[in-house]
């Protein structure tokens, strides 16, 4: 399994060198698709995909899928699927607050049935530019973690702003980055829950989706 994972990552690197944002996921849909919005050429439905790591931990990642790829005549909850697409950021307002949502936009989805024994996959490649000064901290395990926002261009003059997390040996190097640095990164998408304590009232819990960087190249 480990050798296959290494081969998959090498294939991903070769295949994605000519694009700026590419995601490959394989996991189980957690619910039925729900209508999200209607575009010019298609309707789009949202769902979440559950991915089991080799460590035994699970992550759920939100996905947006065109109706073209969805078999609406059958139940999709619990179905194992492979998705290829892009990790995108979307701005929206909640009350009087501006929010940013992260979502995988599916360019292709292949249903594989209900085979839970199939191997999961979570791979991402990004080619973009550091858009603000990195934030570095020491976590509770006494290890350095550096957060970087990567601006990744896509078609129609749009840009996605994607949070990336660097750990271990790459964290110190990432802490020295500055706006405008051109990076290519490989890794996986992860979800993380954090607690925000307002000045008054109950604590708020938020889920963030970010890229856990496993390899990087400065360009």
Please describe what each predicted stretch is.
Residues 1-219:
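OB-fold and OB-like single-stranded nucleic-acid-recognition modules
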């Amino acid at each position: 399994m480990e050798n296959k994972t290494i081969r998959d990552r090498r294939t991903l690197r070769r295949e994605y060198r000519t694009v700026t944002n590419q995601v490959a996921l394989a996991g189980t849909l957690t619910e039925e698709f729900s209508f999200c919005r209607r575009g010019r050429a298609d309707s789009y439905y949202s769902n979440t995909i559950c991915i089991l790591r080799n460590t035994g931990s699970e992550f759920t990642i939100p996905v947006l899928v065109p109706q073209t790829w969805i078999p609406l005549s059958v139940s999709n909850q619990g179905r194992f699927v492979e998705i290829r697409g892009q990790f995108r950021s979307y701005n929206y307002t909640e009350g009087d607050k501006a929010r940013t949502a992260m979502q995988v936009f599916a360019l292709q989805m292949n249903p594989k049935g209900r085979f839970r024994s199939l191997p999961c996959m979570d791979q991402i490649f990004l080619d973009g530019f550091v858009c603000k000064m990195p934030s570095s901290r020491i976590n509770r395990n006494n290890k350095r973690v550096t957060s970087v926002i990567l601006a990744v261009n896509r078609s129609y003059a749009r840009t996605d702003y994607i949070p990336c997390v660097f750990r271990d040996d790459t964290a110190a190097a990432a802490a020295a980055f500055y706006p405008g640095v051109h990076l290519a990164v490989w890794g996986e998408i992860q979800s993380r829950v954090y607690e925000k304590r307002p000045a008054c009232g109950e604590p708020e819990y938020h889920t963030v989706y970010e890229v856990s960087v496993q390899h990087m190249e400065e360009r």
